[in-house]
């Protein structure tokens, strides 16, 4: 009986060691859960960004207003017979 108890105790301790410190232990599992959660958040952010980009692409394909706005803001273009004034702040106030 005593030998069986010692063997069972040794087996229990070996399994506990693997559970807490071995490969695929609980701390590894918790770390991987955190990594999966972080990756899901990153994927959601990228999905939202992609949706915005798709909306911009659709606006550029559909209407001229978005195209004109981009040309004005990003390329500094102006319409024919239109005057553009740039106000530069004074460097020495």
UniProtKB/Swiss-Prot annotation:
The keyword Cell division applies. Keywords: Cell cycle, Cell division, Cell inner membrane, Cell membrane, Coiled coil, Membrane, Transmembrane, Transmembrane helix. Residues 22-93 are periplasmic. It is a single-pass type II membrane protein. GO terms for biological process: FtsZ-dependent cytokinesis. Its main location: membrane. Essential cell division protein. May link together the upstream cell division proteins, which are predominantly cytoplasmic, with the downstream cell division proteins, which are predominantly periplasmic. Part of a complex composed of FtsB, FtsL and FtsQ. This is Cell division protein FtsB. It comes from Idiomarina loihiensis (strain ATCC BAA-735 / DSM 15497 / L2-TR).
